[in-house]
């Protein structure tokens, strides 16, 4: 239901660096240089303790969330959080610890805690940092246009939420109630580094509003159905209008009225887009490293095997501008690139 995107069609050059990677971003309490120094201190202390390898990440997030119900303000919440996470390796033993205290003493205690956990953890032959050859060098970190702070106050957010809910309630006389509407504006930034040579980080944002109307049928056995809809984007300027979100949420609730169960049968099924995306999410989870490593996936050893019809291709593209899952590198600092995960129905990669 989001309005058509106005995103540029061409990606920036690989060597182009984001301004948000270099300068402190508006609305944050901590700068990129401060986070770099924080992470470097943690890594240096880990090496002094005798760690084989170590990684650390400093992050900060802040935002505003407002909820309304039946035209009245229900909740206003401002959040601000920070964290330093440390991972220490002693051979193939790994320990993790984190803190929200950025003092020198707290950093040393956190590194010590991670080190002590690693000392008493069983060895895992797969535990370790990626090879240096796989690391994404800093000059390859693309600007993916992920950071768009939204200068909105609580009154403006409440007004948008009320407009969204009002649009739902006005759609039909059968929309008789609401579980509420909400607006959220969130932003964060981080810096990560480890002893195999990776250094990187960026700022990002995510904004949204949503509504959950209730539809009902009058009568002795009055039926009530609820549904919801939302719009979520990196850039608030690309959000669908509150009215459009409200109307569509109402239409979804109305469409549930009079629904009935069908007898058990075998037949073709057409899934709506939201459910279809959920099916894709199940596949992604099944071919993800964690599930495969724990052998908890139904797609173990599925590489090269048919798991979809021949007309299905699935592309993983980490470089979509303003994409919700886009990133110039993965969680361990490894290079990423567009690739076919499924080609012609066959699994091509995990």
Regions inferred by a protein language model and the residue ranges of each:
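Active-site bordering "gate/hinge" segments
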Residues: 1-337, 343-346
């Amino acid at each position: 239901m989001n309005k058509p995107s106005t995103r540029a069609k061409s990606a920036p050059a690989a060597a182009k660096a984001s301004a948000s990677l270099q300068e402190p971003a508006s609305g944050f309490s901590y700068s990129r240089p401060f986070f770099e120094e924080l992470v470097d201190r943690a890594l240096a202390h880990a090496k002094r303790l005798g760690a084989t390898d170590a990684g650390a990440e400093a992050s900060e997030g802040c935002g505003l969330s407002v909820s309304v119900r039946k035209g009245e303000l229900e909740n206003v919440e401002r959040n601000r959080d920070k964290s330093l996470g440390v991972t220490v390796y002693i051979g193939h033993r790994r320990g993790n610890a984190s803190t929200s205290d950025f003092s020198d003493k707290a950093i040393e205690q956190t590194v010590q805690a991670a080190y002590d956990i690693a000392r008493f953890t069983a060895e895992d032959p797969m535990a370790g940092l990626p090879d240096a050859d796989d690391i994404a060098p800093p000059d390859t970190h693309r600007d993916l246009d992920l950071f768009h702070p939204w200068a909105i106050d609580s009154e403006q957010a409440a007004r948008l939420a009320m407009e969204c809910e009002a649009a739902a309630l006005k759609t039909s006389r059968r929309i008789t109630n609401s579980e509420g509407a909400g607006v959220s504006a969130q932003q964060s930034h981080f810096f990560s580094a480890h002893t195999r040579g990776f250094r990187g980080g960026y700022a990002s944002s995510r904004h949204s509003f949503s509504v959950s109307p209730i539809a009902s049928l009058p009568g002795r056995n009055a039926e009530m159905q609820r549904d919801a809809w939302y719009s979520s984007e990196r850039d608030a300027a690309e959000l669908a209008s509150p009215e459009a979100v409200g109307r569509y949420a109402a239409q979804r609730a109305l469409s549930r009225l009079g629904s009935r169960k069908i007898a058990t049968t075998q037949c073709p099924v057409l899934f709506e887009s939201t459910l279809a995306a959920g099916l894709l999410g199940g596949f992604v989870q099944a071919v993800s490293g964690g599930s495969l490593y724990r052998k908890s996936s139904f797609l173990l050893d599925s590489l090269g095997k048919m798991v979809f019809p021949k007309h299905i291709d699935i592309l993983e593209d980490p470089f979509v501008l303003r994409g919700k899952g886009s990133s110039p590198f993965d969680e361990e600092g490894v290079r990423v690139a567009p690739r076919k995960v499924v080609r012609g129905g066959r699994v091509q990669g995990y």
